[in-house]
Amino acid sequence: MGEKQQPSMNDQLRVRREKMQELRDKGIDPFGHRFERTHLAAQLHEKYSDMTKEELDEQGVVATIAGRMISKRGKGKVGFADLKDRSGKMQLYVRKDVLGEDVYKVFKRSDIGDFLGVTGDVMKTDMGELTIKVTGLTFLSKALRPLPDKFHGLQNVEQIYRQRYLDLIANDDSMDRFRKRTKIVSAVRRYLDGNDFAEVETPVLHTQAGGASARPFITHHNALDINLYLRIALELHLKRLIVGGMERVYEIGRVFRNEGIDTRHNPEFTMLETYAAYFDFHDVMDETEGIFKAAVAAVSDDGKITYQGTELDLGQDFERLHMVDAIKKYAGVDFWPKMSVEDAKKLADENGIHYESWWTVGHIINEFFEEKVQDQLKQPVFIYGHPVEISPLAKKNAEDDRFTDRFELYILGNEYGNAFTELNDPIDQRARFEAQVAEREAGNDEAEGIDEDYIEALEYGMPPTGGLGIGIDRLVMLLTDAPSIRDVLLFPTMKPID
């Protein structure tokens, strides 16, 4: 005798539709209505798990729960099942002599994946498992497709991302990660709200792409007959609000960049940007550290986490290091002495650093950092003092105008935050925009254009301001030990199946 052959998918779909019709023939709606429950599974476990079988029998606790049936066993007149709701699962003990033949048959003919509502006595089995002995059963919704195999979960990575709902049903780790994401974002909001920042919403459709160096998505507004850009950053509208006197603002919103997809990039992602009048970049470092400590507290009691095997301590004070000092420390090259582009290119050649023909000294300093230093930064460190050439919206440093009052937060060689003392001089801002236009003409297709409306806003006066950008998805990846950005996006961008 060979193994019992599994029914084909077509057979399973047909049988489930037949069972749906059986319910209708009995006058039961296979896609039911509102159901009032008294408890979630976890509440029952929390309240009654420590009680003995006898204590529970004596108390006579009755509960009503609802959820998806994820397993079922038993023969004849007695059956067991596991019902899963958003909090966890609960075992059901179902007897024909308690429910009556008709209702018991509804249970027996139900499939894994169906939704049931049950009322019954909370008890413990002889094995000590908290269980509901069902006295009433309501059929709530028929699953016309079988769930992924419960023992193997959902293994196909492509299917996990395309059909996240199946992943959430099958993989508790995945559900837990997205719950943590919600807690992390809430913690960030609470921190900012508690520091008197106002949450605002700014336009997603822009007449000009700005605030970052990135390729935008372009769409067309039919009534106005103009092209619009999906925002590549939140920055320029938020700074207009600082001009308007709001003083402390933040936005958590979707941003869109028409670029490649990899483990750290998705075309649409969630950004946090904050702006505070009268802050400089040192104040923003303190703010950033506060945000990260608030976020990690949502998932860790002591500020320690492990990311892909490396233990990180986000509870400690974060190190602060100038980019030039970091290059000196990790690569042994000193960019403090002023030098010509030729001198910088010579240093690049000697150290095997790539450069483009149009680059200036600042671009080469940045490339040294990215190639020689970045990967060595493991524990949290603020790298500040970026060259002016790569920071078109940051204020120049008062002591050395080759550099800006800007920082990035690095953890495990990856950037988790970008901030600066904002450029509030409209004349300098125009010159920076014009330099970007020149770069674009020289071949940099990610350089920004001139935003005249933004310059006009600056001309009305913007107080000294500190600004910050944090990629929420990357923050969640870090705090939930997720190897890919797709693991923290409920519905990542996927190429359609033909």
Swiss-Prot record:
Cofactor(s) required, per the database record: Mg(2+)
Organism domain of life: Bacteria
UniProtKB keywords: Aminoacyl-tRNA synthetase, ATP-binding, Cytoplasm, Ligase, Magnesium, Metal-binding, Nucleotide-binding, Protein biosynthesis
SUPFAM superfamilies for the chain: Class II aaRS and biotin synthetases, Nucleic acid-binding proteins
Binding residues annotated for Mg(2+) 2, in chain numbering: 415
GO MF annotation list: ATP binding; catalytic activity, acting on a protein; lysine-tRNA ligase activity; magnesium ion binding; transferase activity; tRNA binding
Keyword Aminoacyl-tRNA synthetase listed: yes
Gene3D superfamilies, per database record: Bira Bifunctional Protein, Domain 2, Nucleic acid-binding proteins
UniProt record, GO biological process: lysyl-tRNA aminoacylation
Subunit structure: Homodimer.
Protein name: Lysine--tRNA ligase
